[in-house]
């Protein structure tokens, strides 16, 4: 018999909650920051908002972070896009 702890590895076939989307987005921000793809001041910033938004390919979680430490106003809001199944789909400063 296989005993499971309720945690899956790899791709999940269950939809995640908004709370779980925030956790995954925060983890992705740490990785982006460590890889120097975004400013290190993003690390540790709590999500400002999470919402489900429908795009051309279907619904996704959008997790929004705001960082007043960034000098360029167009880059003070960072959007992370996460599939309903928990995969990181992308990140940008426009929300589109």
What are the residue ranges of the model-derived segments?
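Detector for Asparagine
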Residues: 27, 34, 67-69, 92
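Short, non-transmembrane alpha-helical segments in secretory-pathway proteins
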Residues: 10-52
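A short, surface-exposed interaction/processing loop segment used at functional sites
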Residues: 78-96
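Exposed beta-strand-loop-beta-strand "reactive/processing" segments of non-cytosolic proteins
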Residues: 40-84
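Serine/proline-rich low-complexity intrinsically disordered segments, especially terminal tails, linkers
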Residues: 7-10, 85
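Boundary of Sec targeting at the N-terminus
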Residues: 2-6
């Amino acid at each position: 018999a296989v005993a499971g702890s309720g945690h899956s590895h790899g791709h999940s076939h269950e939809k995640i909650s908004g709370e779980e989307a925030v956790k995954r987005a925060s983890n992705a921000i740490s990785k982006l920051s460590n890889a120097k793809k975004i400013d290190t001041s993003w690390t540790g910033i709590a999500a400002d908002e999470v919402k489900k938004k429908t795009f051309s390919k279907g619904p996704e979680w959008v997790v929004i972070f705001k960082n007043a430490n960034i000098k360029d106003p167009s880059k003070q809001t960072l959007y992370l896009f996460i599939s309903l199944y928990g995969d990181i789909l992308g990140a940008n400063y426009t929300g589109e």
